Amino acid sequence: MSLTLCTTQSETRARNHSRAKSLGTLTSAFKNQTEPIRLSSKEILEESLPCPPQEVQVTVQERTLFFHLNTIWLITVNDLKSIVAPETAFGICSALATSLTTNSSPQLVTVLSRLPHVILWNYLNVLLFDIANQRLPNSIVEDRVNKPWRPIPMGRLNEIEARRLLLGVLPVVFFASLWLGGVVETVALMVLTWMYNDLGAADEVYVVRNLVNAMGFMCYSAGSLNVAAGDYTLTPKAYTWLIVVGLIIFSTLSMQDLPDVVGDAVRGRMTAPLVHGDSIARYTIALPIFFWSVYCPWFFDASVLGYTCSVVVGGYLAFRILFNRGVANDKISWKLWCVWTMVLYGLPLMVRS
């Protein structure tokens, strides 16, 4: 079944041309800007308004089981590389390290048998956060610019359906964590999700946003390790390592804001690139990345292999951030950031014998 929504063509073209010109000007200005971007409340409001009605064909798809599964996939797919994969690696690698749990002789087969549990725990918690985040009006405005393929901008899901989905997912995630392990971390993530989304921490200045994100990543890491370790508990060094992970995230997560600056400006977010300007923001990200690339191997008394992997990947990432600029390059650097965190998470297995 198809529904046709029509407006006067002249009005539509004029408004679309104005919108395209505004966003095009913002994008062009940012490419070479070194000063913070300042948008007036009027400009933010204009860019935040939904797209004007225009002549489009909206196809109503039959909502089969595959349709719903694909919708769930689209909700979470962007965080698979940044959270699910790295945090799963954190849990497995840390559980295999003799210094991070009370298991003095972890068996590879035993730990790997818990891999599906670790993946499921991370995925469920990411699903909960993503639904809570993407249902909010500000997130929808941003996603129309940065991620138009997400379910709500695409029309696969509306705000009311997303809220009801969240109501159903909440108890599922809680009881699943009672079975899988990591229930304390799951409850902590629920609180942080509420702070980040409903209390607006995501829209505060980037320092506050990064702090909440850092605590969230610490919870993901701790939960992953608890699930992977089974009946064994964490050692004092493991808790210190979790603090280091939080500091890494706090000081480098602004990397994700570099390719999203246009959508963040429309939303009115105070990210590092928008507050300090592009050039300064890049140095505030690249320098900590290189520092952690050297510090983390030292923390674990890593072998030559550990130092080499960490310094080479981290050094190349820092170089890319400083010298390979532009949205396309920044998207590649963001993916490399995810790989870099996985390299750091693997360092407990690269210690000197």
Task: Go through the PLM ranges and name each one.
Residues 2-353:
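Multi-pass alpha-helical membrane architecture of UbiA-family
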